[in-house]
């Protein structure tokens, strides 16, 4: 597995939002994926690679401004509605499950950074 170079990042509203993003979302939505040991064992490796590739294609903060479509404006809404992070990711990455107070702060930070939200 590889991590392409970081081309550009968004202007984060705060260091806290950036830290939470990389803790909760960064493994699939950036080029700084931390590949777990089991990501080298088939068939799990295929699933993980597919999920990371799909996540990067949909929304990648390491390619900020370089993608034709960058769905940053959807990030807060998807987190609020429980669509992200996926349940199967949280099982293996308990740090991605935020307490309600931290989740509210993160949603505000995402909205301030990317726009959108409700």
Regions found by a protein language model. Give the residues of each.
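Second-shell loop/turn segments in exported
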Residues: 11, 34, 93-97
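Extracytoplasmic electron-transfer domains, predominantly the class I c-type cytochrome c fold
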Residues: 46-94
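Extracytoplasmic/secreted proteins, especially bacterial periplasmic and envelope-associated proteins
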Residues: 16, 20, 43, 47, ...
């Amino acid at each position: 597995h590889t991590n392409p170079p970081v081309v550009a990042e968004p202007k984060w509203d705060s260091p806290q939002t950036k830290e939470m993003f990389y803790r909760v979302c960064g493994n699939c939505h950036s080029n700084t994926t931390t590949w777990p040991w089991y990501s080298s064992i088939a068939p799990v490796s295929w699933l993980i690679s597919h999920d990371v590739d799909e996540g990067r294609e949909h929304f990648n903060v390491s390619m900020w401004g370089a993608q034709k479509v960058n769905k940053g404006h959807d990030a807060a809404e998807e987190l609020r509605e429980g669509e992200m992070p996926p349940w199967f990711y949280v099982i293996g990455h308990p740090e991605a499950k935020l307490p309600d107070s931290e989740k509210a702060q993160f949603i505000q930070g995402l909205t301030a950074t990317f726009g959108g939200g409700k």
